[in-house]
């Protein structure tokens, strides 16, 4: 193995729906990084995969008269098939329903418990199933989350993580060079933490599609505790410690700006609690918009990446996505621009 390593990840993608060009963009960018560092001679590990637990997945399965596992199997295969068509060079495609992953999640939770950072209480507040996120009253406007997603009032017994214990440690981490980028995104999370952190509800009792909380079968773990830990599982945590030590900490978590808080606040705090080194950098890129709006199936402006490959060729699509959108910014997607870019360059 080379002494120089480069470990890059995409977020793992929800399986409540099929992949679209937003998923393709993140993964194409990550693939470009992976290819570049391999050409430099670095020992590269590129991880992607699917996020398969949570209320959103359970509800999507119910709507389609399927079991959650059936939905996960069907839609995870769609992501895997698309990535094969895109000729991506990922080293592993991880699924959070894998038994190996559950073992790693439970180990991280146990380490957080041993740190004294988990306690039982009652959660009352706003929750968005679409975002799989909790929101303060101050963040709700016209009955919706900042993302525009619908929210519901939740009151239930919950285990909490003492996120408030890690304000100073997080702020110190942000002061290190480029731990969160671009700079504007770092300033966002710094302001969020400086405003004071509430402890985080990390279990739910109103659905059962998830990893059961240890020693309390009425609770399942909050999907982000589960999902974020994939970055440890993917490089052998507990199962190949030599590989894990070789590649961790992660050099680059590449994420969309809508999930920055999870990766740049919750994730490093979980790692601090579990006595695991935090990542080197979290980079939040912008969104592909359609007529100024974020792409979503509910809005009917969803663009199928596979259809674009069929129509325009993989190289054309990949070049367009890397060339058209300034890295870190939002940009509007239009087929006319794709054709124009291809014909002019």
Regions found by a protein language model. Give the residues of each.
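Cys/His-rich short segments
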Residues: 115-167, 171
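Residue-level "edge-of-site" marker
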Residues: 50, 74, 96, 124-126, ...
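Short secondary-structure capping/junction motifs at helix and strand boundaries
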Residues: 86-95, 113-126, 138-139, 153-154, ...
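Structured secondary-structure scaffolds
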Residues: 2-41, 47-48, 100-104, 147, ...
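Short secondary-structure transition/capping segments
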Residues: 87-100, 136-143, 330-334
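Short, surface-exposed amphipathic charged segments that create phosphate/polyanion-binding patches used
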Residues: 107-110, 136, 298
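N-terminal Rossmann-like or analogous alpha/beta NTP/dinucleotide-binding catalytic cores
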Residues: 2-119
């Amino acid at each position: 193995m080379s002494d120089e390593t480069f470990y890059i990840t995409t977020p793992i993608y929800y399986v409540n729906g099929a992949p679209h060009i937003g998923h393709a963009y993140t993964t194409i960018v990550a693939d470009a990084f992976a290819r570049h560092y391999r050409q430099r001679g670095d020992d590269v590990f590129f991880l992607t995969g699917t996020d398969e637990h949570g209320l959103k997945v359970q509800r999507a399965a119910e709507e389609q008269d399927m079991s959650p596992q059936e939905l996960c199997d069907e839609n995870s295969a769609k992501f895997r098939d698309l990535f094969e068509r895109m000729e991506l060079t990922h080293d592993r495609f991880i699924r959070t329903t894998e038994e190996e992953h559950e073992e790693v999640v439970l180990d991280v939770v146990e380490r957080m418990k041993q740190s004294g950072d988990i306690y039982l209480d009652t959660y009352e507040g706003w929750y968005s199933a679409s975002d799989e996120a909790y929101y303060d009253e101050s963040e709700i406007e016209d009955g919706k989350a900042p993302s525009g997603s619908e929210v519901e009032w939740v009151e239930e017994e919950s285990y909490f993580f003492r996120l408030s214990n890690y304000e100073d440690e997080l702020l110190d981490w942000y002061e290190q060079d480029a731990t969160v980028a671009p700079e504007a995104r770092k300033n966002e999370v710094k302001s969020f933490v400086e405003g004071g952190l509430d402890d985080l509800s990390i279990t739910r009792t109103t659905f059962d599609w998830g990893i059961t909380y240890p020693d309390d079968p009425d609770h399942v773990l909050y999907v982000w505790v589960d999902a974020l830990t994939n970055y440890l599982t993917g490089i052998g945590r507990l199962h190949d410690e030599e590989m894990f030590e070789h590649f961790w900490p992660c050099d680059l978590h590449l994420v969309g700006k809508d999930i920055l808080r999870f990766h740049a606040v919750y994730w490093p705090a979980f790692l601090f609690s579990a006595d695991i080194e935090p990542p080197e950098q979290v980079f939040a890129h912008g969104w592909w918009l359609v007529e100024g709006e974020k792409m979503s199936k509910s809005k009917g402006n969803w663009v199928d990446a596979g259809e674009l490959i069929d129509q325009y060729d993989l190289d054309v699509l990949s070049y367009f996505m890397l060339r058209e959108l300034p890295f870190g910014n939002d940009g509007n997607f239009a087929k006319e621009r794709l054709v124009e870019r291809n014909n002019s360059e």
